């Protein structure tokens, strides 16, 4: 909210609000998670001021609710995100993503020789948390990559 207490992004009556997305990540989430493949109204706030983060992105999707699996898959991109469930303009549920064991149908394998590029199969990566990184192992080529490599792909 600004100092004059006006919302910078219009409130929604019913749906999902993904808040505290790192700045410059909002569009990537919309694309990767195919959030725009809906007839519902989507409101996007980019580079909004944030007391905690400095700047943040925000996504509001009317009449759409994310599954727990979808929420947890956000953890790679926006580990500090808050996913709010809205009903009649009130927050009726709030959750934070936690790193899942597997991410399906979202990422693309960076190995150009992986069979997933030539065959009509859904991507699938096992998630392994390490001391300073998160590793993703492709189900098909069984190669392991730093999550930064996969996310940049």
From Swiss-Prot:
Q: Which cofactor does it need?
A: Zn(2+)
InterPro entries, alphabetically? Answer: Asp_carbamoyltransf_reg_N, Asp_carbamoylTrfase_reg, Asp_carbamoyltrfase_reg_C, Asp_carbatrfase_reg_C_sf, Asp_carbatrfase_reg_N_sf
Give the co-factor note.
Answer: Binds 1 zinc ion per subunit.
- Please provide, in alphabetical order, the Gene Ontology terms of the cellular component aspect for this entry: aspartate carbamoyltransferase complex
Give the GO biological process terms. Answer: 'de novo' pyrimidine nucleobase biosynthetic process; pyrimidine nucleotide biosynthetic process
Segments spanning the bilayer are none
Residues engaged in binding Zn(2+): 109, 114, 138, 141
Q: What is this protein called?
A: Aspartate carbamoyltransferase regulatory chain
Organism (species): Salmonella paratyphi A (strain AKU_12601)
Gene name, please?
pyrI
